[in-house]
From Swiss-Prot:
Other noteworthy facts: Average number present in a viral particle is estimated to be 130-200 molecules.
GO cellular component, one term: virion component
Signal peptide (residue range): none
Full protein name: Nuclear export protein
Gene name tied to this protein: NS
Its biological purpose: Mediates the nuclear export of encapsidated genomic RNAs (ribonucleoproteins, RNPs). Acts as an adapter between viral RNPs complexes and the nuclear export machinery of the cell. Possesses no intrinsic RNA-binding activity, but includes a C-terminal M1-binding domain. This domain is believed to allow recognition of RNPs bound to the protein M1.
Placement of sequence motif Nuclear export signal: 12-21, 85-94
Amino acid sequence: MDSNTITSFQDILQRMSKMQLESSSVDLNGMITQFERLKIYRDSLGESVMRMGDLHSLQSRNATWREELSQKFEEIRWLIAECRNILTKTENSFERITFLQALQLLLEVESEIRTFSFQLI
């Protein structure tokens, strides 16, 4: 993962952790947790692609990796929908900037995970 993406994840997570949205903090904490898991998944998938010989070990270690991949795309779509939902409701500029950047990052990560997964297939 390039340093800009790492910084973006860290920055967004840090800013989200300081927010109190009008919706429940449980929803925001859930989003933060999913962002963190998505970052870890994206990193591990990227490392597997870099080692390229890991395709067989990845498949043998986890025969359901395609199902996991599908689940991650579902999580990304949910996070995108949540970011868009928050953007339509909030007028707070700090929140708008944070969730616009989160949305952009999610779209970039989705594209990267698709690229990695096609390389592994």
